[in-house]
Amino acid sequence: KLVDCPIRHLGTEKAQELYLAIQNYLADNGVEMRFNTECENIILEEEGCKGVLLKDGDSLLPVYADEVVIGTADWLEKLCAEHHIAHKPGTVDIGVRVECRNEVMEKVNKVLYESKLIGYPKPWKNKVRTFCQNPGGFVAQENYDNDLAVVNGHSFKEKKSENTNLAILVSHNFTEPFNQPIAYAQKVGELTNMLGAGHIMVQRYGDILDGKRTWAKELAQSNVKPTLKDAVAGDITAAMPYRAMTNIIEFIKMLDMVVPGFAANETLLYSPELKFYSNKVKMDSNLDTNIKGLHCLGDSSGWTRGLMMASVMGVLMGRKLAEKEGC
């Protein structure tokens, strides 16, 4: 299934310029921004949320506000449990970053730039999708808390590589009694990092089908040259859960029917690619939680998946707050 989603490509370097322009605009209009500052907790009173507590050296600095908006990572999950913020366990996506030659994806890249494809491979029929496609892009490493290394991808507006990369993600929706989806995905990532000595692991698709690891010498002789130069050749299947790995393999076979050559032996799979969406916070159409004055945004709220939709949610929140102020 192809999801129709028209986009305009901004590029990593252009995005940085845009974010800086936004930051400068806020600063010029009197908005105080604090970086490298830890928010310890929220301030709750009988009437609702009244502010936040920031770490200020060895003490806590209270910052009061009529409206508090949270757009964080798994810290919000802890807040939900501590303060009884209405929520339900969210989805986590576990998968790989796939890299192939540009000519394999040439027709798709020219027509769509980023194709969003969804499938439900047998036997489990879990939702598997493509995400964050980067024609002429580069595979990159991100580092999360506790030195968790995960793979990602990006592309520049001007500088291009000979490869296209994209994520293939398997959605995991857990049921009772399990309620720690983020911790589950983190463990998968930690195990992969252990096998790769702290580095991202990469394996050729053909080697996976042959039941063998990829060696550095083989990778160096491959037609597809990895754009993440310090990725370690190895066996990603030793850490990837069987169900997720099977879904990924079957989905690649399905994609090969649409994009011939995608399932080539030389296609590279990097691991781990993890997307943490936190628990889904219950909110109404005004983005109000069950606690008065408290709102949640972006992927941490469990309502969006990706930068674009998280940004749109931020614009919506701004408009709602402006309406309350009569602006």
Regions found by a protein language model. Give the residues of each.
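Residues forming the flavin
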Residues: 1-327
